[in-house]
Every structure is written in C-alpha cells, then in structure tokens.
From Swiss-Prot:
GO terms for cellular component: cytoplasm. Its cofactor is pyridoxal 5'-phosphate. The lineage of its organism: Bacteria, Pseudomonadati, Pseudomonadota, Gammaproteobacteria, Thiotrichales. It comes from the Bacteria. GO terms for biological process: protoporphyrinogen IX biosynthetic process. The gene is hemL. This is Glutamate-1-semialdehyde 2,1-aminomutase. InterPro entries: 4pyrrol_synth_GluAld_NH2Trfase, Aminotrans_3, Aminotrans_3_PPA_site, PyrdxlP-dep_Trfase, PyrdxlP-dep_Trfase_major, PyrdxlP-dep_Trfase_small.
Amino acid sequence: MENKSNSQILFAEAQQYIPGGVNSPVRAFKSVGQEFPRFIKFAKGAYLYDVDWNKYIDYIGSWGPMILGHCDDDVLEAIQCQVKNGLSYGAPCKQEVDLAKKIIELMPNIEQVRFVNSGTEATMSAIRLARAYTGRNKIIKFEGCYHGHADEFLVAAGSGALSLGQPNSPGVPEDVVKDTLVASFNDIESIQALFEKYKDEIACIIVEPIAGNMNMIFPQDNFLAKLRAICDQNSSLLIFDEVMTGFRVALGGAQSIYNVKPDLTTLGKVIGGGMPVGAFGGRKEIMQKVSPAGPVYQAGTLSGNPIAMTAGIKTLEKISQPGFFDELGAKAQKLVDGLNEAAKAYDFNFHAKCLGGMFGLFFCSDKIAVNTFVDLGKTNLKMFNQFFAYMLDNGVYLAPSAYEAGFISIAHSDEDIEKTICLAKNFFSRELD
C-alpha cells in the first residue's frame, strides 16, 4: 500500500499532545517494528478504512468486542434510539436490569453481576471482593496472563515459582505487589508449591481460562479443574477472567466448554457491543458483599450507562440466536485450516489454532508445544513481525503483537478468509525462496 502519508502526519501530530501518540501502547506498532500506526477513519462489517483510504480486513475487531462486525445495523439502530433519550443518567435504568438478566441467563456460573466501565475495573473489583470475602490478602496470577493495568497485576515472575511479585512498571510500589504471587500457566506444581508456602494467606487465583494475552494458549491436562480443586481444598476463591473469552469462544464463555465453575467471573468487550464496559459476577453469596448490599465498596460515574447497556443487550440478543456460534466457529476454523495447509505446503514453521471466534498464530512447528509464556518467547517473534508487515501492506490488519490473539467476526466473508490465506501462502513461499 502506497498511501501512508496522512497516518504518518497524524502520528507525528499526536505525539505532541498524547504520550507516545496513542492511548494504549500496543496501538503504536512499536512491538512489530513499524514506524507509525494506521489511523482509522471509519469501519464497516469486517473492514477498517484508514485516513489514507486504505481498506483492511480486520482481525482485531477492537480487540474482541466487534463479534458482529463493525457498525452492525441492529446495534446502531438500538443505540440511536437510546441516544435520543439521554447518554447517561447517573441513576439506575431498566437497561441495566435487562443486560444483567441476559448475562445471568447465558453464563452458567453467574448469579448476580455488577457493571463497571472496563475490564481493568472488573478484575480490580473482583480481587477486592475476593480479599474481603476470604479475609486474606495474597493473590495468585499467572505469568503472561494479563488482567488489566491495576497495580497488583503489573508483576513479573522473578526467579522461580515461589518468588514474590516484583513490579514491572515504574510507579508501582513494591508494597502494593508484595501480595501478588506468580505461577506458570499449565504448571499445577507451581500452584501447589505456592499453597504449601502461603496456605492460609491466599485469597484467590485469577486466571484467563484460555490465555489470550500470550497469543492463544489452551489449558492442558485438566489444568482448570485442578485449580478448582486446589481452591476448594484451601478455602480460596477461583476467578475466571473472561473479559476476552466471555461470549467470544462460546455463548457461555470458556467455563461452559471446560465445565469448571469459578466463584467469580470478569467480563468486558463483547458485552458492550463496542462501547466501554466491564462486569464482574458470580455466586450470590459473594456478590452480596458488594456495596450497598454489603461492605465492599465499588462505584463508577458511568457504570451501567444506558448507551453501553443498550449496545450490550442487542449484541447478546443476536449472538444467542441458534447457529450463531456454529457459523462463527466455522469461519475461524476455515481460516486456521487454510493457514496451516499453506504453511505445510511450503514446510514453513508456522501453525494456527482457534476456538469459537478467537484464534492464535504461532511461528514455530506444530510439533513444538506452546503451553506457557516461556514457550511462546521461544517462537520466531522476528518472523511474526515480518508477517505482520507483509499482511498489513496487502490489506490485512492483524494484532500488532505476537503475544495477542486474533478475532474473527460473523461479518467476515469466505472471500475475506480466502484472500487472507492466499496472502499468507505468498508470504510463506516468498520466505523460502
């Protein structure tokens, strides 16, 4: 694509007024070695159009929410009707009740739910609630699992599974993260070791049931069921962070696929239909501790605002129609199968996998197991960057990081998928010349 000048100009201007020129670091494209990101002018269906009028097949979908595609007619109509009645009330509204009822109907282990404004707020609030409910302070998270930018989550593993968390962002005091313990995803022994050392101090385990912030890593060997058992044995809570996987890999989230019951679940992305939203919910006994029903404080000026609630209601109505996830999953499977076949044809070290409307791309042989954050770091990250650049220049917009999952929408056509596969095939053949 030749037309890049307006994005370059805007990025230079943005850096004068916005730190780094973006409002979320990954958008800068630095992690994939690009000089500037593409500034988007508008979006429709499966496509993004940038300020230079380049068209892209979009496999980010605003990082997951756009499961129906951009500017779905029914969602837009619902929002437009609500806009005429007000943007935000700072008071309860019927839409909050309707969306809560729909979530509880569809998610197997949520009895009550509280709305917030982002996934970070949801996970932060769930941790506070778990600590209050158990009367304990320590939490366990997993290396490579991202739960938002609250201080207690910005932790690296240190040396060894038993190391206390050390902050990996300036501005996070060590005292804030001293109660954050870090284990290795899919390594149940690292969890057992932490409980042996801190048995009566651990309030909860928080985990992405499918790790979508280290590409797309699935739980192995009944890992989630084993976490459930350990939490039960030690009177700790199990929190599933389904901000990404909720209503994305299946209608009932990853917990419905693996049939493991968390005590609390965090949600976001899809439940807002593209509007800013988050939620946390779970057993009524626990949720009744949240203010004003109980003593655990949580509040938000725009929480439960009618615009986000309306978008969420319409989105969940549409994705809960019979056959929706069969069709969505078939699209993702066609993409993944085509990419894998193309790589195999050229004996290229690459494999892809998917579940529901979510997929992962790995630049290594399919004979190499990628089950942990460390495993992912051993894949060919440089080759991913080259692949990203080639696909972007040819009109395919992938996540600008080898550590991020991709998303497909119901709006993606067979032609979109076939074009993507064809371009990947060209890349694989070119790299072997």
